């Protein structure tokens, strides 16, 4: 049986990696070995940062809610505790949006939380 070289498979694999490395600076976008290393690292970063994005957005929402609460004379933890006691089930994303865009409705929620604490 004749020896089979990995011609077409290798070319296909190299093209796939170089396509993923498109736009990288210098040899990281041109040479297969270096591009392959960079693509592997980039995919690792992408996986990690998809998890981190969720944490960062939650932190941002909490910061916005806290700032709006303090303008209305209540701390964040008392506000959240008051909402839970009042039976209000609005997630932090919606609360942050209300705090930025609909201050009147947010103020009503703050009053409700103050009464139930």
Curated annotation (Swiss-Prot):
GO terms for biological process: ribosomal large subunit assembly; translation. Keywords: Ribonucleoprotein, Ribosomal protein, RNA-binding, rRNA-binding. The keyword Ribosomal protein applies. SUPFAM superfamilies: Ribosomal protein L20. GO terms for molecular function: rRNA binding; structural constituent of ribosome. GO terms for cellular component: ribonucleoprotein complex; ribosome. NCBIfam families: rplT_bact. PANTHER family: 39S RIBOSOMAL PROTEIN L20. Belongs to the bacterial ribosomal protein bL20 family. Binds directly to 23S ribosomal RNA and is necessary for the in vitro assembly process of the 50S ribosomal subunit. It is not involved in the protein synthesizing functions of that subunit. This is Large ribosomal subunit protein bL20. It comes from Natranaerobius thermophilus (strain ATCC BAA-1301 / DSM 18059 / JW/NM-WN-LF).
